[in-house]
């Protein structure tokens, strides 16, 4: 729309019979920006944050995020671009908005020798101002900020670092931080991946109150090599405890957990497995599970991709009540 691989975002509304686009395409700034690599909507759908990890606003591939508001006529940018710190940061690779759209968390997984960081900004009706310091990854090559998910009020943020080595090379981990009106303080310990090579934390989703977090580990081999899994944890005011057993992918190579999305209260989770072959090679699928206070039980059948090579489940998003699911297929 604005040059080769500039990228764009389209927003659609359901009118009880069909999906109708709201406003025009929201185009990336320039060629090769890959705008739309990440996207997050406010709860009422009137504000959207869009990541463009390859944007060059602060150096080659520094990345940026733009936030737009719907004024009943068009999408208007709120404030200026939120640029990455430095060249090569790929800031905007992940993004998450608070429910009212006034706070945004932005992942830059390649910052500072691939340790990665997350920055959180608040809208003051004039500009986007950073809240607290950068939330840096633990070590070089952690890729912290590859995924990010924020509580409804923006006070708690879960950050995935899929390449962290806390439980073996590239086992991955998630850290959860809370804003105490002065700084971002980690809640509990690291939530480490199960084993080396799991890349746990490449996807993450947190409940609206920040007390439940779902973590994808698509290379976990609990049900065959790279079957993938999702683990769900609950905060008990002192530590993170796993809810139920691992939710394993169906078969080897499924890469289940590449995408994950929780219902607002954390009781339902949608899981994307774009490598699944249920409707042809790499057709992909999504499974939805509900917590029954004892275990995670699948709701309904697999939601299979339309055809071979669709890689359906590459992205997934649940509505707040868990009754609707949006599924991306490459």
Q: For the regions a protein language model found, what residue spans apply to each?
A:
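Conserved beta-strand/short-helix segments
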Residues: 1-330
